[in-house]
Amino acid sequence: MSSWSNQPAMDDYGLPSSNPYGNFTVVDMAPKDILHMIHPHWYQYPPMNPMMYPLLLIFMLFTGILCLAGNFVTIWVFMNTKSLRTPANLLVVNLAMSDFLMMFTMFPPMMVTCYYHTWTLGPTFCQVYAFLGNLCGCASIWTMVFITFDRYNVIVKGVAGEPLSTKKASLWILTIWVLSITWCIAPFFGWNRYVPEGNLTGCGTDYLSEDILSRSYLYDYSTWVYYLPLLPIYCYVSIIKAVAAHEKGMRDQAKKMGIKSLRNEEAQKTSAECRLAKIAMTTVALWFIAWTPYLLINWVGMFARSYLSPVYTIWGYVFAKANAVYNPIVYAISHPKYRAAMEKKLPCLSCKTESDDVSESASTTTSSAEEKAESA
């Protein structure tokens, strides 16, 4: 690292030999081959506290191992358990795959840059790194959108809704990846660009350039990849209303008949579907918690850049990377049939509880109904 950190790197690029913002800045730690990608805004900040890098490295090591292991197990269990190979669960597998790919491509480079305290992997890989991060994040959110639409179709529309088939689920997944690639490949063709973040340990979209072309990309990307996917909120409101009406009807009918409960096979099916909807809602909520900081960084960079320092830019992708860990944990804890399959295939990782027997019965009913719908 001493090869580029002992002298200001600006001299070799024809820039003023004296830094107007101070004797040594965070940019002076960067290799010369990426200086043309760094916005002048970052020249006014001193290097980050050296303790930030080992802390970030430890965090990435912890989340990287958890994410890769958790999502690999999720994919393996779903694909090797016949009762879990339903059209709806193809979306779950796609979600785990996008999370796995995100950490598989983000984790090793972050370890390297944290070790050297700056981006050392060259300008080309900086662009590839940012592209892959955006691509996997975009695929994750749109997968959650389609999972929500499927739950809405099953719970709110019921028998009136068209059952999800393998062909339709596959078409949805293809749409997700085509949409994601289309948006994320645009910066390679001049609509915005991928550049090093202010902390110089990662790369992302350019939110500091003031030209209309760069900003228009961020406006459109934010709309299609963040704001538009907020539509599932409407679906969840409808789901909650449908579940509340169903439960009230069950209680009223049981009261009239003088019995404790009307829970039968159909009611168990509805209960299992509602649990799956809660899982999806939790996962979507965690996704927005994870990606909102990065969105805020982009918008602050466009309209209030004076508040944006290199340290603040770390939190955006720290939260974003942590999102890839949430999903396998949510499904492992909340999906009865997944727990049952993991209990059988990987007893050392099981988390089965005493109440799982009843939940598993209800979940089996749901899966059977889905399989019948698929074959119809």
From Swiss-Prot:
Chain segments carrying region Disordered:
353-376
Span(s) of short sequence motif 'Ionic lock' involved in activated form stabilization: 150-152
Q: Residue ranges, Cytoplasmic compartment? A: 78-89, 150-168, 238-278, 334-376
What job does the chain carry out? Photoreceptor required for image-forming vision at low light intensity. Can use both retinal and 3-dehydroretinal as visual pigment. Light-induced isomerization of 11-cis to all-trans retinal triggers a conformational change that activates signaling via G-proteins. Signaling via GNAQ probably mediates the activation of phospholipase C.
- Membrane topology label: Multi-pass membrane protein
What stretches pass through the bilayer? 53-77, 90-112, 127-149, 169-189, 217-237, 279-300, 312-333
Q: Sites of the modification N6-(retinylidene)lysine?
A: K321
Query: Keywords of this protein's UniProt record, alphabetized?
Result: Cell membrane, Cell projection, Chromophore, Disulfide bond, G-protein coupled receptor, Glycoprotein, Membrane, Phosphoprotein, Photoreceptor protein, Receptor, Retinal protein, Sensory transduction, Transducer, Transmembrane, Transmembrane helix, Vision
Instruction: Extract the InterPro entries matched here.
Output: GPCR_opsins, GPCR_Rhodpsn, GPCR_Rhodpsn_7TM, Opsin, Opsin_lateye, Retinal_BS
Q: What is this protein called?
A: Rhodopsin
User: What's the family?
Assistant: Belongs to the G-protein coupled receptor 1 family. Opsin subfamily.
- Subunit and partners: Homodimer. Interacts with GNAQ.
- Topology check: give the Extracellular ranges: 1-52, 113-126, 190-216, 301-311
Superkingdom, natural source:
Eukaryota
Please name every pair of cysteines joined by a disulfide bond in this record.
Answer: C126-C203
GO MF terms held by the record: G protein-coupled receptor activity; photoreceptor activity
Compartments it resides in: Cell projection, Rhabdomere membrane
UniProt-listed PANTHER family: OPSIN
Query: What processes in GO biological process is this protein linked to?
Result: phototransduction; visual perception
GO CC annotations? Answer: cell projection; plasma membrane
Expressed, tissue-wise, as follows: Detected on rhabdomere membranes on photoreceptor cells in the retina (at protein level).
**Where is it chiefly localized?**
membrane
Which organism was this protein described from? Procambarus clarkii (Red swamp crayfish)
